[in-house]
Amino acid sequence: CAERFAQSFADTYGMTVTCLRFANVYGPHIDGLRKQPPFVGYMIRELYYDRTPEFHSDGNQRRDYIYVDDLIALALRVVEHPQKGFDAVNVSSNQSYSVRELYAIANRLMGKNIEAKYCPSSHYWAKYPELYGGAYGIKPEILDHEVNKFSQCDNTHAREVYGWQPQVDIETGLGRVIEAETRMLEGLEK
């Protein structure tokens, strides 16, 4: 793990090294146009075009999301107030949201009422047969676990050591992303 190497260098050479562990980062300029965009970008793009999004899960999976401006604010504090030796800091909201919860917020903020389609996670990965083959193919159950995992980070260390806490709640952050993505998508239509 990279953190262990960083800690080894910090310990061996007396270096100051801080690793930032990002939760799911979202914010304006998320790439919603690529073939397989991040969840937030995909959801906004499909709603913008009045299409039914297909989520490859039951929608109950929960993740911790952090708005990009909050991440930057913490990164700046870490640079301005470095701790001696090695440090690892979770950059997170300390809250988790399900696919269904985020979709409901985006649907409402965009003034839409489009029901999502929930499919088995295996349908998503079927588009990538190269993942399963070869000498180091990934087992389907590992990919399924990746889709269905729960993640929530504890940002107590960031709050206590760096005096930081996230300022942008999920609804405000999604609203900003929707605004930016809508402007971008409208620009493509001109």
Model-derived segments and their meaning:
Residues 12, 43, 145-148:
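Short beta-strand/turn micro-motifs at beta-sheet edges
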Residues 1-18, 23, 47-49:
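Active-site Tyr-X1-5-Lys
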